[in-house]
Amino acid sequence: MALNWSFRVIFVSTMWCALLKFATLGEPKDDNDYGGGCPFVVLGNGTHAKPAGCSHLCNGAPETLDNIECYNVTEEVAKRMTPGIPYACWLGWCNKGECKRGNRTEVCYRGSEEE
């Protein structure tokens, strides 16, 4: 009787391990819909990244940001910045697609394309 019980425990344990292994082999499912948008150009400050401006064209249509901190720099200027060189950038706040400049600056830089 004990042999029969041991066999059942081993069999169930083996099947459970096999099930867990096969259940985790697939790619994780990503249920988020990113909407096929275009990424904004961002500038870093060593600890955080913020968008350069609050609007741009994506496939001919405007995309805007609202209610987040930004750098009051156009995407065109940000793209011309030399990667890794520190710049003084005006901080702002996105309001209806426009980066409203505040009264503070902070060091910002453009990262390399690999980042």
UniProtKB/Swiss-Prot annotation:
Subcellular location: Secreted
The keyword Signal is assigned to this record: yes
Signal peptide (from-to): 1-26
Cystines in this chain: 38-58, 54-94, 70-99, 89-108
GO function terms (MF aspect): C-C chemokine binding
Keywords: Disulfide bond, Glycoprotein, Secreted, Signal
Keyword Signal on entry: yes
Domain of life: Eukaryota
Cited InterPro entries: EVA_Class_A
Pfam family, one: EVA_Class_A
Glycosylation sites: 45, 72, 103
Gene Ontology CC annotations of this record: extracellular region
Function: Salivary chemokine-binding protein which binds to host chemokines CCL2, CCL3, CCL4, CCL8 and CCL18.
Protein name per UniProt: Evasin P1182
Organism classification: Eukaryota, Metazoa, Ecdysozoa, Arthropoda, Chelicerata
